[in-house]
A protein has these predicted regions:
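DNA major-groove recognition helix of helix-turn-helix/homeodomain DNA-binding modules
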Residues: 46-61
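Short amphipathic helical patch at the helix-1/turn junction of helix-turn-helix
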Residues: 2, 13-14, 42
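Short basic helix-loop element that most often maps to the first helix and adjoining turn
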Residues: 6-25, 50
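Recognition helix of helix-turn-helix/homeodomain-like DNA-binding domains
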Residues: 28-42
Length: 76
């Protein structure tokens, strides 16, 4: 799921967060999150829901079926 990896990276960067900060918020290891971003591991369905909720996007947006929302002027 290469588009998922790209979207995770883009969403994290838009928010100015480190991988470690996202991993802590999701209660997973930083290595696991890194593997998601590098397309080395696919998140299970419950984690996909947590990721979408964390970033405030739909599953369709997260998975690339719909475009990601444009960043707001506040850097969102």
């Amino acid at each position: 799921m290469e588009i998922l990896s790209l979207n995770l990276f883009a969403l994290r960067k838009r928010r100015g967060l480190s991988r470690e900060a996202v991993a802590r918020a999701l209660e997973i290891s930083a290595m696991t999150y890194q593997r998601y971003e590098k397309n080395l591991r696919d998140p299970a369905a419950p984690m996909l829901l947590k990721l979408a909720d964390f970033y405030g996007v739909s599953l369709d947006q997260l998975m690339g079926r719909e475009p990601l929302p444009e960043p707001s002027e506040k850097g969102d």
